[in-house]
Amino acid sequence: MNKMFVCLSVLAVALAAGGCRGGASAQQKQDLSHMNARQRDKVGYEAAANLRRTELKEDADTRVTNIRYRASDDTLVYTLMLKKISSPEVFNAVQRRKLDVTLHKEGRKEVCRNRNMRDLMIHGRYSVEYRVLARNGKALSSPIRISAKDC
């Protein structure tokens, strides 16, 4: 159960990158919704670069190893490493499935709770994806993809 808490806490740390919960103004929402694909890509690359400068950090349990923008589907991709879990093999099949379900559920809940992130996804048509890795670099769960339809 302690490992589950660590996994959920890393997700909360990663989701803090979304900023404050104030939300976008009406003008910002309109600007986001009127962007074409090239403009969305430019903003996405700039956002990923800014997030890399401010959010690539490390604490006792987690490390945000990379934040990048994937232009093919307008997605900000976070790569997180849980330092206390050496390998996915420490979980049996039932525990891994439960971990996967919990990470997906909590991830969607936290991202959708944040107004800025929700506005960015709904009006800007962006998505967020989290890849959670063990200390050895192997995936702990399937990628957690959150889009506007999840909110």
Model-predicted regions and their roles:
Residues 1-8:
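Bacterial N-terminal signal peptides that target proteins for export
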Residues 17-19:
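C-terminal motif of bacterial Sec signal peptides marking the signal peptidase cleavage site
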Residues 21-23:
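Bacterial signal peptide processing site
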Residues 59-84:
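Short edge beta-strands and adjacent turn/loop segments
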Residues 80-84, 132-136, 146:
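A mature extracytoplasmic/lumenal domain signature
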Residues 86-114:
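Long, charged/polar, surface-exposed segments that mediate recognition or autoinhibition
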Residues 104-141:
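A short amphipathic beta-strand at an alpha->beta junction
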